[in-house]
């Protein structure tokens, strides 16, 4: 089993690459010693964003939300995301994220402050919605 533990990452990236309908979604975690890029389904990232957003919202408006969540290129996919487990540690006021591959042979974990979680939720939402055509009624 390959395990990657980051604590609080130095950087996070999220992006979608390719043509609409065939896009590859990635989540990138950078620590002091390594950068790990994971392939995700759009629905997995959307669910993560929704959960992070709800936790941040429940805790009240956090401080400054970072907005730099660009993926560092080029990248190599370390593994495909199977399950994402998220827990809010209320005592420490952090969000713990654990991601495993479908066969559970690979795993990574990292911790987010409410500010980083809020910024990441926004970045994920932007990446997920970027390929959608504009609504003909909304413009």
PLM regions: where:
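Positively charged, low-complexity terminal tracts
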Residues: 1-139
């Amino acid at each position: 089993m390959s395990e990657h533990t980051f604590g609080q990452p130095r950087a996070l990236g999220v992006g979608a690459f390719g043509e609409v309908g065939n896009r590859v979604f990635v989540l990138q975690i950078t620590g002091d010693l390594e950068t790990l890029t994971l392939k995700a389904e759009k629905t997995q990232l959307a669910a993560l964003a929704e959960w992070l957003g709800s936790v941040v919202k429940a805790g009240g408006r956090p401080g400054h939300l970072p907005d730099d969540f660009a993926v560092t290129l080029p990248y190599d996919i370390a593994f495909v995301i199977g399950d994402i487990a998220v827990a809010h540690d209320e005592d420490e006021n952090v969000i713990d994220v654990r991601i495993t591959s479908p066969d559970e042979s690979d795993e990574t974990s990292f911790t987010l402050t409410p500010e980083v979680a809020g910024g990441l939720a926004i970045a994920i939402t932007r990446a997920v919605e970027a390929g959608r055509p504009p609504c003909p009624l909304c413009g």
